[in-house]
Amino acid sequence: MNILVIDLTHGGVKIAVSLAKKGEKVYCYDIYNTLKDVDRRMLEVYNVRLIELKDLKEFKGDIKVIYPVHLPLTSEDISKNNENLNYTFITHHEAIAEILNGWGEDIDKIEITGVKGKTSCAFMLKEILIDENPLILSSLGSLIYEDKKEIILQKNISITPANIKETIDLANKLANPICDGKSKNQIYNSAIFESSLGVSGIGDVGLLTNIVEDYPIAQGRSSAGIAKRQVFRCGIVCCEKDSLDKYYKDISHENVNSFSFDDKSANLYVEDVEYCLDETKIHMVFNDVKTKSGKSVSGKMEIETFAPGKHHVMNVLGVAAAALSLNIDKDTITKGLKNYKGIPGRTNKKNMGNITVIEEINPGINTKAIEASINMLDDNENYIISIGGDYGITCEEIDEDAVAELINTLDKDIILTGEVGKSILNKLNRKVKFIKDYNSVYELAIKNSKNLLFIYRSDYRKLSKR
């Protein structure tokens, strides 16, 4: 069977080469014309041929088309180039599952998707699994932990499904520096993979954090909620209950564990919560949580961790559900979450000079996230609130009109910053301060002895500068 991999911008090269190494006859279509010379040479080495869709008219028999879930083409757009072919269509996620068939059967594997909270959940789970030397793909990079020490495998790596395979390959190269084609050593005993639009299905547990926004993809022909249905290919699914009820009622899956802030029909919910900007105490109840061993567990758990707002607590609930699903004991879960202090360059709290700074830095910041971050201050008047960001961070841009409408309703000291802040400034009907350089916002807060809530839609290229 011929294989056509579409989209070389979002991991297609890795998928194509991986399949070619298995002896498959592979072709590629570079739909966005972004192929780099080094990748072009890599394809040539493995006899992977670049084609246009019109070239399909020369093909005969069966063909498997591997496409990303956000592809701006329909199956009809592709098949019309040769209607005599016998087509099979699978996503990049599904292709990775096929490529990795049989991998990691002796370790715990978690795949994380959702609109918000993915990276935070990944690093909370890292704290819980730290003794198992976790291998991690996250939006902050490919990492591995050995004896609780972080080893960076690769920075500036996207969470496209192909990079699950890339992360595994990087870990194998680290353990086996002499490449003889045989994997002799394995450092990691667990794996945590973050993915943006669904999961591959190789996870023992698939964690769907939420669908707080069902934004359109594939030129409006699909959506985030539809793409993330792929999480139900995992053996056990942990899903925020509102999202489960709203988007996935039609799915039949034997091992679904739901979590909710206050819905007692969920498998895991909050009984009581005591918020604090340093460490929030969460009393949770869990009932009939399905686990990897095949048994169900019930009980109560008290968590103390960095979760200053309700949206952070929801992340904790998802992580707790995922950990319980892996038969991890309560003591290990509570100890791991107590060690979680936020993520530098993301959601974290720190002291700078004489002030406290809470940073909410995220490429997917939206109006709801901004509102939730402001609400966690609980009318504390000793805070400056700074809102801003960069453009071109993710496929979906921020709704500036909605953010402006929110700011218009706030009776708080607001500073706008960055490209996004400048654009929002022109949409307001109230006066707020604009500071172009976000570093100057920190300086102003320190000078005036005012604590700072810094909410920023980030460009990862600038993370190292903060």
Predicted segments with their positions:
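Short, basic phosphate-binding NTP loop
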Residues: 1-111, 278, 439-445, 464
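ATP-dependent carboxylate-amine ligase
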Residues: 1-35, 44-45, 65, 130-131, ...
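Adenine nucleotide phosphate-binding catalytic loops in nucleotide-utilizing enzymes
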Residues: 5-8, 21, 28, 221-222, ...
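Active-site regions of enzymes building and remodeling cell-envelope glycoconjugates
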Residues: 24, 39-52, 82-90, 149-155, ...
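Short, charged/polar "capping" segments at the starts of alpha-helices
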Residues: 33-40, 58, 71-79, 144, ...
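Walker A (P-loop) phosphate-binding motif
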Residues: 97-141, 148
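Conserved substrate/cofactor phosphate-moiety recognition/catalytic segment
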Residues: 134-169
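Flexible active-site lid/hinge loop adjacent to a nucleotide/diphosphate
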Residues: 155-251
